[in-house]
Amino acid sequence: STPPKTLFPYTTLFRSKKNVQNPQTTAAGSENTAETTAVLKQQIKVAALKGPTAIGMVQLMENAKEQTAKNDYEFQIAATADEFSADLIKGNVALAALPCNAAATLYNKSNGKIRILGINTLGVLSILDTGDSVQTVADLKGKTIYTTGKGTTPEYTLRYLLSSAGLNPDSDVTIEFKSEAAEVAAVMANAGTEEVIAMLPQPYAATVLMQQPDTRIALDVTEEWEKLNGSDSTVVTGVLVVNTEFYKNNRQAVDDFLKEYKSSVQYVNSNVDGAAQLVEDFDIFKAAVAKKAIPKCNITLITGQEMQDKVEKYLKVLCDANPNAVGGQMPDDGFYVK
C-alpha cells in the first residue's frame, strides 16, 4: 500500500484575484473608471519528494501559501517519485524535483517527455564513525561499512568513491547492507565500545548524530568525491525537471519558477532555523532534524552547461555500474535545458 500523499492545494485554497478598482460614480452621475490592473497568475503543479530534494523549495512553498509567489503553485510532496511520474509525463504535473537517476530513467522510458532544468541537491551521503580512525577514504581499508541501498545509487556511489581512492570495494573493505536506515542506526546505537562505521543519507545521518552524541561525521561523501575526481565531477542527488510540452509553451513561467527557486535556496542556506521550521510545517521532516541536516544536504541550483557536465559525469558512473540505474542507457543531449 502506498503512503498517502501530502498535498498542498494552494491553487484552490489561495487563488490569486484580479486587482480591479471599482468604477467610482461622481455626483454628476458620470462614471470615472479607474485604471484596471489585472494580474492573472498561471496555475502550475509542482511535485517533490519527502526528503532533501524538497528542502530547497520550502520558502517558495511558503510564498505560494501567502500568495506572494509569481504564479499560482500547487505543491505535491510524495513519498516516492512513482506517485507522480505518470502525471509528470502526461503534463498534469509541470515541474518536479526528483533523484537524478530517476529523471534519466523517465526521460529514456518516455522518449523525451521530460527535460532537466537544474541540479537542486548535490550529495546527501555522510560516512559516520563512532570512533576516530577514519579521516580519509583510504582509512576505510580493512573496515566494515554498514549502509543501505544495495543495487541502487548509494552502493554505486560508495564503490566509486572507494575505487577513486585506490581501494578495491570487494576485497579491501566489507560492505554490510541493511534494508533500512533505521537498521543501520540500530547497529551504531548498540556498538558499545566497538567502533562502527556507516554510510547514511540525510536526514537519517542527522537523526543518528542527535541520538548518539559520540558519533561523528567522518567524511562528507560529496567533498571526498570532488577531492578525488576534481570539482567538475560530483555526486548529484536531486534535480529539477520540467514536462517537455509545458516547457515549450511556458518559457516565461519556467524562468520565473527558476528565479523564485534560486531565492528559496539562498534563504534555506542562509536561514537554517527558519528553513527548518518550514520543513516541519510542510511535513517533510521534523525541524530539529532539519536544522542538523540542512547544512549537510548540499542544497543548490546549478543550471546550463555546468549542470549538464556534472549530471553527465555522475550518470556515467551509475551507467558503468549498472545501465538499468539510468533507464538502460545514457540520456542524449535533448535531456538538458541549456
Task: Cite the ranges covered by each PLM segment.
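Short, solvent-exposed loop/beta-turn-alpha elements that line the ligand-binding surface or hinge
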Residues: 64-71, 223-233, 299-308
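Conserved C-terminal helix/tail region of periplasmic/extracytoplasmic solute-binding proteins
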Residues: 312-338
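Short, small-residue-biased leader/transition segments that mark boundaries at the very start
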Residues: 2-13
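Short, glycine-/small- and polar/acidic-enriched structural segments
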Residues: 19-177, 202, 216-219
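Short, high-confidence coil segments that cap the C-terminus of an alpha-helix
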Residues: 93, 193-195, 318
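Pocket-lining segment of extracytoplasmic ligand-binding domains
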Residues: 101-102, 110, 182-278
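A bilobed periplasmic-binding-protein/Venus flytrap-type ligand-binding module shared by bacterial periplasmic
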Residues: 59-61, 125-134, 234-253, 300
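Secondary-structure end/capping motifs
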Residues: 247-321
